[in-house]
């Protein structure tokens, strides 16, 4: 069967000479990221023209307005961007014609007006920009018509794209290394047998095939039945397809460029160079995180977290409270009992997850009928000074389960444990304004307490407490409210326990957030994980070399030098440690990272390396990546061979 081209330039999917040959030299591409955001399209200025016969001046300019609206200048950048959008729509013209939708290709020139005048935001601005002769302009009405036209067609394109994607991913039209081929008739029968019956590629095979030929380099229609041999069509996106394709020399040029661009933007927008500044910075410099954090309050030492308080009474304290018209007992003790100091807590949703917690019913029968709850305890004195029930002013039940513990338990290997159970509380600080001593605790509401509870602390604070910030009104450091943060004071000044137990508003986490962003940048663009030397390691070596040389010459030998090979190894370990766990730089005693000046040297060195980087970034990994891609191509060849065997072409 001949591959006849109609007047609409539609290729026959069964045409003679059709081939399918994926090659790593060109990747499939179209236009998934045409940039239509403000800043690309705006601002360009409006059309102004002179009024009167005198010499042109800013005072003589008037804004051009008619029944089509005002006129916006179509700059070269805007024209290129809109033309790409129009071309992307027109690529689907065979399907628009087959389905009798649309009215021919979209032509940008049909929406523009050629005029002469001045272009700017104001009359003064336009006059200073100079005269524009025979320039292209878009009237307000035409802008809206163009937008509606493209949007309406994209609605249809979105549906067709989904069906084409299904068919083409079935065929796997790209390889990452080398070349492969498959007999077109075999591959076509394979796809026709497998594609869902409602896939539109079955209804309009030639039209979809024609569109695919413009998007996928692997598809090459054969020669039409004409006396004059015509060249085989190439995809419309062959420039981007070529530059997106991985190369054996430097990997992906597009990938390297994107990684460097993202890294430079992150460094500039997040002020990462200030991560070890030794002067106070306003907290607004840092980007606080509203991400939830999870803790185990029963195991947090109050010395590590200002929001944890501890009761250390010698004897149990029992307080009666009323909940849903029933009296219950809340008990503190025996032994140290840790609670939340609500005056040190941030505005947050608190969720105490006690799922799986062991219920010692045999040791304490009181718990079987008790109700798990989260309560607020208001005291007359600080909690550590509470010695008797009269020191407690009142108890408020914030959240309680709907049933007793015995009905909420499940037996696991002989131990009764809580089934899935979450206790929730929404906390806003203004609700406790003026109350100096108020504490939150997960515990049991015991209806009929006995001596069984005298030897069993009913606390539930060993559950997982998730704190989801609602609003960060203030920043704290070491328990005190601060307006500024000095990063160098925070660095290498915390224990790992303090870092783990810090709330979202703590200066430790603000600086930690900066460190994580810096570590992400370093990991993305610097080959720290490889065995090669890199900019991050080099920056650290420079600082280590000074200190090590000073120590070596302390004995009087003015020419003594340290073992630089060992310094490179130490620096490599430190750089790798930072990239994998940047919070280590906050902790006391961490080798190298805790040393003064190391992090600022790393930040400066990495920033310079990124700003002066090139598209050849991927060269260090190109060889290993090429080997991996070649292995994938071998698997693809095996796949196509099986297709040809199972669907032999006639």
From Swiss-Prot:
Function: Interacts with VP7 to form the outer icosahedral capsid with an incomplete T=13 symmetry, about 80 nm in diameter, and consisting of 200 VP4-VP7 trimers. Myristoylated N-terminal peptide may be released in the endosome and involved in permeabilization and delivery of transcriptionally active viral particles into the host cell cytoplasm (Potential).
GO cellular component: a single term: viral outer capsid
Locations listed in the record: Virion
SUPFAM superfamilies for this protein: Membrane penetration protein mu1 (SSF69908)
Subunit comment: Interacts with VP6 and VP7.
Top-rank taxon, per record: Viruses
Protein family per UniProt: Belongs to the aquareoviridae outer capsid VP4 protein family.
One Pfam assignment: Reovirus_M2
UniProt record, GO biological process: symbiont entry into host cell via permeabilization of host membrane
Protein keywords: Capsid protein, Glycoprotein, Lipoprotein, Myristate, Outer capsid protein, T=13 icosahedral capsid protein, Viral penetration into host cytoplasm, Viral penetration via permeabilization of host membrane, Virion, Virus entry into host cell
Main localization category: virion
Keyword Transport: no
Protein name from the UniProt record: Outer capsid protein VP4
Molecular function in Gene Ontology: host cell surface binding
Lipid-bearing positions (N-myristoyl glycine): 2
Protein's gene: S6
Chain positions of site Cleavage: 42-43
